[in-house]
């Protein structure tokens, strides 16, 4: 099969203006399998990211990944477990799978971070079995940046743990706060607990227990409970919840945002007068679309491991995978793993290593 051509990178000078340059050259292991648009789209994203100073180890079917540039090394790994029903069993049974080999490269020190746009369950399983949890971490967690214009909100967990205990959510709060400090430069991010009411007495027993523990944590800027409608109102910088609730909330917001853009487009073309107004409003509407588009966020951080991971959306195009790789690179340069561990250690929220089993985390496919 002839090698495919790589698309020319678009001009991103305006979009990337003001972003912090990558301080060193991190190496990112990227799983090219599992994306809805195929490995070629991931390869294009890797090419765009490499042009911004990142080295990439690209794991996938070499025949579909094209001619790699000087900063990209293609590792032929055509086997995918992204669609397998049991991610944990598949990750153990298929060590040659692309996601497993990418995670192993991170564990062995060949790469600094992992990026995948395939199955969440497969990426979690491969990461837990190879990269492993950081010392004292009970459960890894997925932290997504909710694309609120001008003020991204870190939502954690968004799918790694469908069932949790109070101590898990306490650790998630500290991990999310450390991430917000590094990524957004917030010296003391406001942390809130997602619940069915703002009062301290509202919520499940787990939420009540977590509220009490976070209120007593002087190291944390805990601002209390927050309801779902307030996620985008700027009341908190970090919102903590279990993976089931967080995943549902995130996907509802993504769906509503997408539908609103579609309705605006349809309305702007509905009449001659609307078309004139649409032309005048087009620059502003495009700016809003770009601000809230999931691809701009770049995916979710996988926190609590010995190395950082970023899980992109399977529907991402090249632009989204580029952002996912750049997210991972900036997390490496910002030492998110070290900052998270230090924050938990200072707060006394780490468990002794002997009390943490390697198989204690819930792995859920999505």
Language-model segment annotations:
Residues 112, 118-168, 172, 178:
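Glycine/threonine-rich beta-strand-loop-alpha-helix active-site module
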Residues 2-64:
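N-terminal phosphate-binding or glycine-rich loops at protein starts, especially the Walker A/P-loop
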Residues 70-111:
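Phosphate/nucleotide-donor binding subsite
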Residues 128-155, 235-239, 243-360, 366:
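Glycine-rich phosphate/nucleotide-binding loop
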């Amino acid at each position: 099969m002839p090698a495919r051509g790589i698309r020319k990178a678009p001009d991103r000078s305006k979009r990337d203006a003001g972003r912090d340059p990558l301080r060193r050259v991190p190496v990112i292991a990227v799983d090219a399998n599992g994306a809805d648009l195929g490995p070629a789209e991931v390869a294009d994203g890797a090419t765009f990211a490499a042009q911004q100073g990142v080295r990439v180890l690209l794991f996938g079917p070499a025949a579909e990944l094209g001619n790699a540039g000087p900063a990209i090394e293609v590792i032929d790994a055509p086997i995918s477990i992204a669609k397998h029903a049991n991610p944990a069993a598949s990750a153990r049974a298929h060590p040659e799978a692309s996601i497993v080999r990418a995670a192993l490269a991170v564990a062995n020190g060949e790469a600094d971070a992992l990026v995948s746009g395939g199955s969440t369950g497969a990426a979690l399983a491969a990461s837990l079995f190879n990269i492993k949890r950081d010392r004292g971490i009970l459960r890894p967690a997925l932290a997504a940046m909710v694309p609120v214009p001008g003020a991204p909100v870190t939502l954690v967990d968004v799918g790694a743990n469908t069932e949790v205990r109070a101590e898990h959510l306490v650790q998630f709060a500290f991990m999310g706060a450390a991430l917000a400090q590094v990524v957004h430069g917030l010296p003391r991010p406001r942390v809130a607990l997602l619940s069915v009411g703002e009062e301290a007495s509202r919520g499940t027993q787990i939420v009540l227990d977590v509220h009490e523990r976070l209120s007593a944590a002087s190291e944390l800027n805990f601002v209390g409970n927050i309801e779902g409608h307030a996620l985008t109102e700027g009341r908190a910088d970090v919102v903590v919840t279990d993976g089931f609730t967080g995943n549902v909330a995130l996907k509802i917001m993504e769906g509503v945002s997408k539908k609103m853009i579609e309705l605006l487009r349809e309305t702007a073309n509905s009449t001659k007068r609307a078309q004139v107004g649409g032309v005048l409003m087009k620059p502003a509407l495009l700016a809003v679309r770009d601000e809230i588009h999931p691809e701009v966020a770049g995916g979710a951080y996988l926190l609590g491991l010995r190395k950082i991971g970023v899980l992109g959306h399977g529907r991402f195009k090249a632009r989204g995978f580029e952002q996912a790789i750049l997210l991972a690179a900036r997390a490496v340069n910002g030492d998110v793993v070290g900052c998270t561990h230090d924050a938990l250690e200072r707060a006394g929220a780490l468990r002794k290593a002997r009390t943490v089993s390697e198989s204690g985390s819930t792995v859920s496919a999505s």
